[in-house]
Amino acid sequence: MNTDVEFHIRQNYPWNKLPANVKQSLGNSQREYDKQVLLYSIRNQLRFRNNLVRHVKKDERKYYEELLKYSREHLMLYPYHLSDIMVKGLRVTPFSYYISIMEDIMNCEKSYDSLPNFTAADCLRLLGIGRNQYIDLMNQCRSSKKFFRRKSARDLLPAKPVEITVEPWWVVQTGYITEDDIRICSVAEKAAIDKMIDSGPQLAGSMEYNVVLSLYNRGYIYLDVPISDDSCISVPPLEGFVMNRVQGDYFETLLYKIFVSIDEQTNVSELANVLEIDLGLVKNAVSMYCRLGFAIKKGQVISPDQLHPSWKSAPSVNRLKGTMDPQKMLLSWEGGSPVMEAGSSATDTDTTSLEDQDTASVSSLSIPAAPTKRIAFLFDSTLTAFLMMGNLSPNLKSHAVTMFEVGKLSDETLDSFLMELEKVESTAEGEAQRYFDHALTLRNTILFLRYNKDLTPDQGPDVPNIGLPLDLLRCESLLGLDPATCSRVLNKNYKLLVSMAPLSNEIRPISSCTPQHIGPAIPEVSSIWFKLYLYSVTGQGPPSLLLSKGSRLRKLPDIFQAYDRLLITSWGHDPGVVPSSNVLTMLNDALTHSAVLIQGHGMHGHGETVHVPFPFDEEDLKGEFSYSNMCAHKALKILRDKVDLEHQCGYITMLNHNNRHRRRASDADGDAELCGVLDANGSNESFELVTEENNGDGGKKQGTEASSSEDEWVPLELCFGMPLFSSELNRKVCQRIVSHKLCSKDSLQELLHSSRKLALKVLSFVQSFQDGKQPADPDSGVSGPLSQPPAESGVPLPAINLLFKDGELKEWSGRAPPSLHISAPQRDQPT
């Protein structure tokens, strides 16, 4: 549907008030507009009254029946905001709605994964049917077909809801109750119904707990989860969330947008203003979080004298269990363990209060302080995949699911997260070691960034400097917000953004001038273009050939004939090292749908790589080049003059093609462990390069020092941010952030200016290879949930083939010698 048409429907514009251009887009047909109004209203589950649809559809009951049918067919969440209509008018309770959905998908023999995430979570809550239960039901359904008396799917489904969690501040409303229903009620149930009929809706906590459950199970009442303008909520690690699929309907999209934007200090009204979303929709979404148990309402929600005695033994919505005093969680990133207050010992922990802490809400973990801006650590989905796949500790998965689905792990939940990371062992075997390394390095990074007084300037003698809180944010979730909204959310809550390094090429990095960003300044800095920019300004780099989409190779270019291993980067995907012997078919397949960068990596097996952390220390720069003092390399000295490495942090990967003098222990494990292989879509097995580089980072062996010369090493890539794949590299970067005072006000101001300069230079460099008519390729990346921008969206594809060889970047025509020198002057430009 046209966005202009949607806007005018949302604003209740009748046909005669529509602008001429909108009418023209509808073919000047009022009937077409009426069809769009009805479709939009049903898709967005709009109430009949006070909306434009009432002028289009005269029969209110029929409209709601169509809405319910559409929602059921598309497996949408039950429209709880229309409960008064659905339950009282149509006698369709949430239980009966989800039973019909389950019956439909079982009759069609669909998999459990066909249920969208939030719908599956609500089915689990009400029906008690999760993945395993669904598989059992399907097996029973199929086996019954073999016998004469086959059972229908409905016969196998539960007859009444499982016992749900009800919070005392929820509101109980009467549903559709007949005289026959009243006759079978107990005395207490009749009294409760009479009170609601006479006095109106009642707080659940003021009624007898078992009566509320009994009436709900029979469908005589429904439950409202009231959210006011000034309500604040907290989101603990998700329990009971089902990771199936993202559907993309209006409400699910809204739920994900609010997930990543919400925080404990911002009330619902303020959040609606920041997101520029209708307040009623935001309340509906927050109400749904609380209903599903994914969020907890903060503050005193019901006074103790209102609470019926029966509620004392009632179960509560899942809560984050805190087992440490937050005042004792001021952590030392150097020591890696909590810094206990003077005079305290391990036995000083208040063990008598642990049971109370188990049921405490998330807010009890936060260090009492006035609302303050925070540091945001930006990560991508590969990190959450590592935390999920590694089976690292029993309760770590719920945090990883929260990081992926909510897109955020707030400071209030980091105590629990750190305790789970503490349980991760430091050693593992094979592939699992990579997951363990990332988990342990992530823990060290959190300890370093969170409440680190070395990262924040003193506020004065009256204000104690304890550092800043830390939130973890998933880049893909932020990209689900439009750029203006994302900027408002970041500016409202954060003082500094820090990216992990490297971020996956499959996502578009977050660009931000304010708050300042220690990470890629613009998406182009995380693209293939930036590699070529580095090579052109330093005059050094591996032989590299960037082929435009649609190119075709008849043979491997001569510059790569001497190489045993090539580094292949398909546009919008992560790089992989592949053998040169069988690369041609793979390259031509990838070139049909993507631009591809080919680089020489190793002449005798894999090339050797070393990571050089920056900012550089002055003492190291004054020294002579050596394997252990790589920052004295002449290419890096040139790079320092062209790119600001003093007010940023990250690492530069140096590559040595001639690695005959050393054989890694990992080489004995075979090529499968280290080589990334492009799949049919041109992507590769993720992080194959990281594995190899990580092995190389620690590979300082006897004889390497003596045989390394400066000319053997060339810069391969530069990554801004904090590396997580190597704990030693991460430790060095953390030390230099402190020693170079990167988070000081002056340094951050310099970072702002230098990031803008770098952005302009890189954009100018990219533009020099465009014909001015090259559009951004919509198929250049992989789109994910919430219709996020595709990878490298807005980053132009190359219009010509480019070759970097012998210190110069040239246009490559496919013949030797190459023509047209392009970027030799780049190295002579002043900064």
UniProtKB/Swiss-Prot annotation:
Cellular component terms, GO, for this chain's entry? cytoplasmic vesicle; trans-Golgi network
Source domain of life: Eukaryota
User: Would the keyword Transit peptide be found if you checked this record's keyword annotation?
Assistant: no
The UniProt keywords, alphabetically, are:
Cytoplasmic vesicle, Golgi apparatus
Task: Give the subcellular location.
Answer: Golgi apparatus, trans-Golgi network; Cytoplasmic vesicle
Q: Which InterPro entries match?
A: FAM91 (IPR039199), FAM91_C_dom (IPR028097), FAM91_N_dom (IPR028091)
One record GO biological process: vesicle tethering to Golgi
Q: Where is this region: Disordered?
A: 341-362, 690-709, 770-794
Q: Which family does it belong to?
A: Belongs to the FAM91 family.
PANTHER family the record matches: PROTEIN FAM91A1
Could you tell me what this protein does?
As component of the WDR11 complex may act together with TBC1D23 to facilitate the golgin-mediated capture of vesicles generated using AP-1.
Quaternary structure and partners: May be a component of the WDR1 complex. May interact with golgins.
Name of this chain's protein: Protein FAM91A1
